[in-house]
Amino acid sequence: MPKARVFLAWSGPRSKAVATALRKWLPHVIQTIEPWMSENDIEKGARWLTEISGQLQNVKMGIICLTPENLLEPWINFEAGALSKINDSIVCTYLHGLETTDVSDPLAQFHGTKADKEDTKRLIHTLNSRLEGESLETTRLDEAFEKWWKDLETDLSNAKGTHAQEPPKR
């Protein structure tokens, strides 16, 4: 059975670090999930817009990595909107350095997940419940989460120091 793909949306250095951390971590916790991230999963020479559009049409789960720096980025809103138009899809905003009250519409319409242990665990349970016959039993899922949480927590902590660089002056 093919793995369930999860689209990881990001924009900016800190958001990219969060998405990268999730891409590495998710398959350890739920082995039947295959995260997809543009930075890593588009081959050199491929048409990136075509690749992203194809992924957005064929996934049922997406995680939008939000940070204070990218809340108003058009691409984040585009990807969230594209994911939300798919029948039976879920769009999970993952808030790094943000509170749910920091997020405005249209992204506020999605029930946000804070990048902390308790809320991330709830997100994992949501993703697992969407795996249609491939989900892990709750005890096994909780054990895997506890085993791998420290790795994600470390990577999320390291992402806090990642900020956008000033654009070069002409």
Where on the chain are the PLM-derived regions?
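Conserved TIR/SEFIR loop-to-helix hotspot centered on a Trp-containing motif
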Residues: 2, 68-86
